[in-house]
């Protein structure tokens, strides 16, 4: 979430897998390549692109982010990567781009890919409707961000980091929300996303084995019960996540995870704590649902 976008494209093109669970359902499933390309940070192309790909959950995608493709030389490098993916996969890569410069966009579109231009169609339609031609420059989305919005965002991120994983509890009175759940249930990334995207001051606290089997909240949480929000995650999924961190341990065993899951659901019910099953949700979906369920108002955005 806090990745800084370098203006060197080679530092941003390491692939990641989206819809990874589709591979566990079908080992013979072909992994499809997808590229998010922009002459700016590529945040918009990546955010919209990943949202669209999430609608095809049965297809695993190997994704690459190529920001700052703002010269013909960099466009040619992007074309080479797309063509290489096509030769390797035998399938046209999906190419999501938000390139404003028509010459650079045309070069990228010359690659052997399924081009999904996110700007051209929209900009043309808006120009037709308003009678005003676009200025053709990238990056204006951030021109009018005022200093107060920036400060709110940074303050919220600092709060999330300072109050991560139950490290500090004395500032919980300043929190907008306190996420709770078992270890590795998605509390930290959700807290950071709430801070970064909405300016929400989110703390998070892991309920330990002792907390769970006492069937009561720790004292530091009882005092702020009205701010608590619980995360739940499917037992099978949580076992896989914990195995990646500590394979073969009691911590990652099915029996241990199942016991923790039952115990924490009991606490949520007995204490009247609102909760959400996040097993098949992206962090964006989790954060949005939390705002919807709690009525929290975003400070920015």
Feature map (PLM): residue ranges:
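N-terminal accessory targeting/assembly segments
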Residues: 5-6, 17-52
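Small-molecule kinase domains that catalyze NTP-dependent phosphoryl transfer to phosphate-bearing small molecules
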Residues: 160-167, 244, 251-286
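Short beta-strand-centered segment that lines the nucleotide-binding/catalytic pocket of NTP-utilizing
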Residues: 202-213
